[in-house]
Amino acid sequence: MQILNRVLLVSFALAVTSLPAAPSRVPIILDTDIGTDIDDAFALALVINSPELELLGVTTVAGDTQARARLAAKLLWEAGGTWRKVPVYAGEPEKPQPIEQTRWANGFTSSALHRSGAVDFMKSEINRRPGRVTIIAIGELTNVAALLKSDPSMAKQIKLIALMGGSIARGYAPDSKPEAEWNIKSNPEAAQTVFSAGVPLLMAPLDVTAMLQLDAAGRHRAFTHLTPLTNALTILYHLWGNETPTLFDPMAVAMLIDPSLSETQQLAIEVDAQGFTRVVEGKPANATVGMRTDPKRFFEFYLSRVAP
C-alpha cells in the first residue's frame, strides 16, 4: 500500500509539473492626457478589463495634470475593488486649459491620488522591475522624455514603450496625406528624445487609429451595459460633448495585448521639428509600427471586454 501511495504521489507531482505555466501579466504604467478627448478614458477602461496587464500606476501629462489625475483616479475608483488602490501621479503642470470632463471629478480625493511625482514614480517602478515594465503612452511624450533625460540608464531598463502617435502613410482623414499627429506635435522635442533613446517602441499611428469610430450601435452597447465603469464612461462621453468618438488611444493598449489586431512593419522612425514621424531608409528599425487594421475586429475585441 505504501508503495502504491508513493507511486500515486510521484505521478501526481509529474502531472502538475508538466502543466503549462500560467502566462505572466505584463506590468504597465499608463501615461495619459485623460480628459481632453474621450479616448483616454476608453483606453483606461480597456486596461481595467484586460487580465493580461498588471497596472502599476497611472501618470498624467499636459496642461492641468492634477485635474487629469483626479479624473483618472475617480475612474479607477468606479471600477471598484483593488483598482481603488492603483496609484495615480500628476506630471509637471503646464498652462491649464479648460477640460470639461474633469468637472466629473471635482473635489474627488483618494489616498491613491498624488498631486505630483509622475516621473519619480515611473523611475521607482522600473528600478523595482528592471527590464520588465512597459510604458503605454497615450498623450504627448513629455513625461517619458523627462524620465529618459533624468536617468539615461532607464533606456535599457524599460521593456517597451507602446504609444499612440504619429502618422506614416495617412493622416486623420481617409485618403489623406501623412500629417503631424497631435501627441507628437504637442511636444516634438520630447518625441525626438523618446524615438532616439533606443527603447523598443510599439507604435499605433493614425494609420491604424483614425478609422476607429465608435458607431451608434457600439455606443449603445457600451452605455447600456450599466456597470459603474461604463456608467462613468457614459457621463464622460456627454461631458465631452461630441457624437462619434474615435478610439485612437485604446489601439495602443489593444496592440500590446493582441498583436494580430494590426498588421505591422519594422521601421526606422525619426521625428522632425514640426512633429512629423518620418520613415528613414537604410537605418536600423527602432519601432514596430501599425500599418493596417480591421476596425470591425478591433471593436469586437474592445466591446467583448468593456461591455461583454
Regions found by a protein language model. Name each.
Residues 1-6:
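Positively charged n-region of N-terminal signal peptides that target proteins for export
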Residues 7-18:
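Bacterial N-terminal signal peptides
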Residues 23-34, 38-74, 83, 110-205, ...:
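Active-site histidine-anchored catalytic micro-motif
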Residues 24-25, 43-50, 54, 182-308:
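Conformational coupling and interaction surfaces
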Residues 74-77, 220-222:
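Short, hinge-like loop/turn segments at secondary-structure boundaries
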Residues 75, 79-89:
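A glycine-rich helix N-cap at a beta->alpha junction
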Residues 86-113:
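Surface-exposed loop and adjacent secondary-structure segments within mature catalytic domains
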Residues 99-101, 172-174, 214-216:
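Short, well-ordered secondary-structure micro-motifs
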